[in-house]
Amino acid sequence: MITTDFVPGSPCWLDLGAPDVPAAAAFYGPVLGWEFTPPPGTDGFLLADAAGRTAGGIGPLTERGARSAWMPYFFTPDVHETAASVLRAGGTVRVEPRDVPGWASLAQFTDPQGARFAVLTPGPAGGLGAVDGPGGLCWTELYATDAAGALAFYETVFGWQHEDTPMPGGDGTYTIVTPAGQPAERMHGGVLQVGPAELTLSRGTPSWHPVFAVPSCDEAADRVRDRGGIVVIGPETAPGIGRMAVCTDPSGADFVLMTPER
């Protein structure tokens, strides 16, 4: 499970680069039950709250040619050290380590297969507050064309532990990842081997996908459709996991809705 007790390599933030920030807020607000506030000193950025706790952010998409996408951030005590580890492991630095005064230190990267991710050292007011509950991040998932290579990279950078488990129906293997030295209940994501043809949502490039917890996957999926998004897969039940739907927002950013099995 994802918690707010951040340890090295655990998810601690996520944000969306959107071509139209107000339109994105108008979509995600009803779908996930979020409310939005502009933090002081920012230009066009909105913080999302779920039941009074910070659930992430939405900011302007400024990179020419880039697609709208969610970016996961993983905790690090030292963004500079992690940036060096990324380079040694074959990744690239997209955004050099920098400080956001009063909030956090961060850096953004691309792994060797092209998936984008970031790291964060939160300040006292930084990081996610809404996790594993309605409207909160409850899982992170990487679709990779070389799952073994991806795991080797992230284990080098973060020291993640991993465990393979059969996919439902015996169709392939799903790899669960957990921060270094943490028990199995601190698992925070998975890596799935896919072919290039299965990466249409991310224009053929491996990518990370956020999974948001919702009280009713079916009702949330209806809200996605009502507000101009697309339900690509589902809702469908994954035995032992919950009810899930893969969706895209009106700008094409993909995400997953899940009502966990209790």
Residue ranges of each PLM-predicted region?
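Short amphipathic beta-strand/extended segments with alternating polar/hydrophobic composition
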Residues: 56-59, 185-192
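Vicinal oxygen chelate
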Residues: 1-7, 11-19, 46-47, 61-85, 91-138, 142, 163-184, ...
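Short acidic, gly/pro-rich beta-turn/loop elements at beta-sheet edges
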Residues: 24-26, 58, 82-84, 150, ...
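Short, low-complexity, polar/charged sequence segments that are solvent-exposed and flexible
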Residues: 33-35, 56, 76-77, 93, ...
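Core segments of cupin and vicinal oxygen chelate
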Residues: 2-53, 88, 96-104, 142-186, ...
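Active-site-adjacent scaffolding segments
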Residues: 40-132
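Carbohydrate-binding/catalytic loop surfaces
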Residues: 196
